[in-house]
Every structure is written in structure tokens, then in C-alpha cells.
Curated annotation (Swiss-Prot):
Subunit field text: Interacts with ATG4. Interacts with NBR1. Interacts with ATI1 and ATI2. Interacts with SH3P2.
Presence of the UniProt keyword Membrane in the record: yes
Gene3D superfamilies with a match to the protein in the record: Phosphatidylinositol 3-kinase Catalytic Subunit, Chain A, domain 1 (3.10.20.90)
Role noted for this protein: Ubiquitin-like modifier involved in autophagosomes formation. May mediate the delivery of the autophagosomes to the vacuole via the microtubule cytoskeleton.
Name of the protein this chain belongs to: Autophagy-related protein 8f
Site (described: Cleavage): G117, F118
Chief site of localization: membrane
Amino acid sequence: MAKSSFKQEHDLEKRRAEAARIREKYPDRIPVIVEKAEKSDIPTIDKKKYLVPADLTVGQFVYVIRKRIKLSAEKAIFIFVDNVLPPAGALMSSVYEEKKDDDGFLYVTYSGENTFGFGSP
């Protein structure tokens, strides 16, 4: 998978400092970077940085992403952390502890496909 554009735009020290500041100020929240998969035809999300409640499940977070990109009901959405599809029932805090980047952010990539096999007219 290509290097995150967030990582390309901000150097490691700046990202580390920002993640540490966020975790200190909001200890019950997870700093998450959300980016669309390169070859996906799903809409692009309007913002990349999210502060997610630690007790939110992956499934609930997927719902948040779906709302932000205004995804129609017949479209599926899949999120990947480190190229792996996390379980929908997993807490974001446990995914964060297992998969957070060296800079302190959790990087989530989303992608979609049409689950019913037909496109827009």
C-alpha cells in the first residue's frame, strides 16, 4: 500500500508531537488518520484527522466514515488497519494499542464496492 499522504505532508517529529499532545489532552480518545484506498471509486472523505472515543467499536467507526462520505445504502465500505480488516466488534482502543504507528496515530484506509452489483444510471 502506498505511503499515507498525511505522512508525506507532515514529518515524523511533527506527527509524534501532535499525537502526544492529543493523547495528553484527550486521554480517552484515539488519534486516527482516515484515508481512502488509492484505487477505490468510493467518495473521498472531507477530513483525515479524527479523535475517536476509546470505547467506540470498529463497526461504529465505519458508520461514522459512511456518514462523512455520504455513502449510499447499497454500497459496502471496508476499513483496513495495516492492510488487515479489523473485526467490527473490536474496540478502537484495542486496535490502536495493537496497530498504532510509530508516530502515535492509528492509520485507517477505507475502500468500497457495490454489494448489489449495479452502478448508478
